[in-house]
């Protein structure tokens, strides 16, 4: 399965629309957002995807985000999200909680550790986990998202045009 990975969208609606179009065109139907959504109105852009979200340090109104996420059928948004795809365990969190990151990697429980926060693309192995940061769609020199193929383990960095 191809899993689309986004983070740090910071309410940049036009760029997020372009990113989601690119993911859709690449055959992605499942996405995760690693935090800093910032506005509940962003969530409606993800309609048509199976989507999971986590809160970032910029998601000040977590109550409104959760209310909208539930209304749209995505479910609750917490500090982290753990799930499994094709036998691979995945944890998603924003990345500003460094002890949580270290614990996730040190535990050896996760095939994939997905985070955001730094606005920089990352794809590396730490212990037994692959760490993926898709970059950002706001506040970065280049706007990027990622696609993880859970069957092959391939991670693709996708550049999203600003305009």
Question: What role is predicted for each listed range?
Answer:
Residues 10-15, 38-41, 59-64, 97-102, ...:
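Active-site environment of divalent metal-dependent phosphoester hydrolases
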Residues 1-45, 49, 66-74, 78, ...:
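N-terminal active-site segment of His-dependent metallophosphoesterases
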Residues 52-95:
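Helix-adjacent hinge/juxtasegments
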Residues 11-25, 92-107:
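Pre-active-site segment of Zn-dependent metallo-hydrolases
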Residues 25, 77-86, 108-109, 125-127, ...:
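Binuclear metal-dependent phosphoesterase catalytic core
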Residues 71, 110-112:
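Structural recognition of alpha->loop->beta junctions
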Residues 49-51, 128-129:
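A short helix->loop->beta-strand "cap" motif at the edges of active sites that frequently abuts
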Residues 6-7, 30-36, 52-57, 92-94, ...:
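Active-site neighborhood of phospho(di)ester-bond hydrolases with catalytic His/Asp-centered motifs
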